[in-house]
UniProtKB/Swiss-Prot annotation:
Subunit-level organization: Homopentamer. Interacts with membrane protein M in the budding compartment of the host cell, which is located between endoplasmic reticulum and the Golgi complex. Interacts with Nucleoprotein.
Protein family according to the UniProt entry: Belongs to the alphacoronaviruses E protein family.
Localization per Swiss-Prot or TrEMBL: Host Golgi apparatus membrane
Membrane topology: Single-pass type III membrane protein
Annotated keywords: Apoptosis, Host Golgi apparatus, Host membrane, Membrane, Transmembrane, Transmembrane helix
Biological processes annotated in GO: disruption of cellular anatomical structure in another organism; viral budding from Golgi membrane
Origin organism lineage: Viruses, Riboviria, Orthornavirae, Pisuviricota, Pisoniviricetes
Gene name, Swiss-Prot/TrEMBL: E
TM segment ranges: 16-36
Name of the protein in question: Envelope small membrane protein
A cellular component term, taken from the record's GO annotations: membrane
Length: 77
């Protein structure tokens, strides 16, 4: 009974440990949510700054390299 003020059968310690566990779980969940938001933000940024211009350059290249098919008259001879 040394250092025991109230005989609560470790209820206070149990409650404190559960609070610590819940706080850790909450922090992990918040971190995961923030990480997912960061991934979406990076994707939107790359979509505007990298993927969009590359797509435009590719379409310009496609239109430049396009070869019209031969007319039917030329093929028949």
């Amino acid at each position: 009974m040394f250092l025991k003020l109230v005989d609560d059968h470790a209820l206070v310690v149990n409650v404190l440990l559960w609070c610590v566990v819940l706080i850790v779980i909450l922090l992990v969940c918040i971190t995961i949510i923030k990480l997912i938001k960061l991934c979406f933000t990076c994707h939107m940024f790359c979509n505007r700054t990298v993927y969009g211009p590359i797509k435009n350059v590719y379409h310009i290249y496609q239109s430049y390299m396009h070869i019209d098919p031969f007319p039917k008259r030329v093929i028949d001879f």
